């Protein structure tokens, strides 16, 4: 389950159970398939050390905030029923 942010950015949730169990709910922002940032879901905060510009940060925070409940649901589902690989 991926959420398109703009033409080259999207938001995705870890698919593996172990990854979801290891950390608090978060999503990864990818640019053309490469992870460039991590965003915590509650509260919505972008992790330092990312490679996004100010406009992208604003757009990411807005998009994640608007989809936070759906992302948290998917994270919790994957925590229980995600892949074992």
Predicted feature locations:
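Generic detector of bulky aromatic hydrophobic side chains
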Residues: 9, 31, 37-40, 60-63, ...
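Generic preference for hydrophobic/aromatic residues in regular secondary structure cores
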Residues: 11, 45-48, 67
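A short, structured beta-strand/loop element
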Residues: 16-55
């Amino acid at each position: 389950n991926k959420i398109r942010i703009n033409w080259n950015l999207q938001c995705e949730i870890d698919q593996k159970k172990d990854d979801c169990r290891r950390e608090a709910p978060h999503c990864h922002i990818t640019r053309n398939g490469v992870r460039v940032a991590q965003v915590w879901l509650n509260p919505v905060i972008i992790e330092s050390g990312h490679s996004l510009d100010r406009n992208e940060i604003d757009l990411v925070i807005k998009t994640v905030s608007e989809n936070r409940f759906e992302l948290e649901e998917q994270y919790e589902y994957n925590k229980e029923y995600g892949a074992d690989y």
